[in-house]
């Protein structure tokens, strides 16, 4: 095989392009991610606007149920506390609730999930299709995960919140890890009480907590 001294140059803007691609994929929820990716990068190479679907265009088909926090809570209850769930089993649960197959496939593709799925990560990405911002997404996740039945504000263990916020921020790609660390340190030291729980209001109503 002939040798060559030619080097492959990676453009410095590639990491940002990939971060934006991930966000646009979550927003668009294409049924065929590979085909959509080809169209996406093809449009960018031609200097055209990539085929990103806006939230207002995401109208569910009449034969599918619309994804809601309530349905995600039902799904979470059926996962029954497991941290890992098999893809086929989760797909069947999703199908029983009559939720859109293309959305399931999109979450699977964006999360790069295989046969064994980390449930909290899947749930976080599913919630991100409903939440406009990271704070809104985390609010929905808290509502889904909260097991309080006394009518109080939704709350979850801070350790769970820490895991979810770190993961969602990583997928989003626009928030530095140092900012995430600062916010988590502040919340842990100044907000979290002896019970170790975080309430939705702790990160949506506190002016010193800016998750984005």
From Swiss-Prot:
Annotated transmembrane regions: none
InterPro entries: ROP_DD
Disulfide bonds, paired cysteine numbers: none
Tissue distribution of the protein: Testis-specific. Present in the most inner parts of seminiferous tubules (at protein level).
Region span, Interaction with RHPN1: 209-212
Compartment(s) of residence: Cell projection, Cilium, Flagellum
CDD domains noted in UniProt: DD_ROP
Post-translational modification: Sumoylated, sumoylation decreases upon spermatozoa capacitation conditions.
Positions of modified residues (Phosphoserine): 56
Biological process according to GO: cilium organization; flagellated sperm motility; protein localization to cilium; sperm capacitation
Deleted gene: phenotype: Mutant mice are subfertile with normal testicular morphology and spermatogenesis but moderately impaired motility and increased levels of ROPN1L. Double knockout animals for ROPN1 and ROPN1L are infertile with normal testicular morphology and spermatogenesis but defects in sperm morphology, thinning and shredding of the principal piece. Sperm is immotile.
Zinc-finger listed as a keyword: no
Domain RIIa: start-end pairs: 12-43
Superkingdom: Eukaryota
Principal location listed in the UniProt entry: other
Keyword set, alphabetical order: Cell projection, Cilium, Flagellum, Phosphoprotein, Ubl conjugation
Cellular component GO terms, alphabetical: cytoplasm; cytosol; sperm cytoplasmic droplet; sperm principal piece
Family from the record: Belongs to the ropporin family.
Additional facts recorded: 'Ropporin' comes from the Japanese word 'oppo' which means 'tail'.
PANTHER family, alphabetized: ROPPORIN-1-LIKE PROTEIN, ROPPORIN-1B
Assembly notes: Homodimer. Interacts with AKAP3. May interact with SPA17. Interacts with RHPN1. Interacts with FSCB; the interaction increases upon spermatozoa capacitation conditions. Interacts with CFAP61.
Notes on the domains: The RIIa domain mediates interaction with AKAP3.
Function recorded in the entry: Important for male fertility. With ROPN1L, involved in fibrous sheath integrity and sperm motility, plays a role in PKA-dependent signaling processes required for spermatozoa capacitation.
Protein name per its UniProtKB record: Ropporin-1
Species annotation: Mus musculus
Lineage, highest ranks first: Eukaryota, Metazoa, Chordata, Craniata, Vertebrata
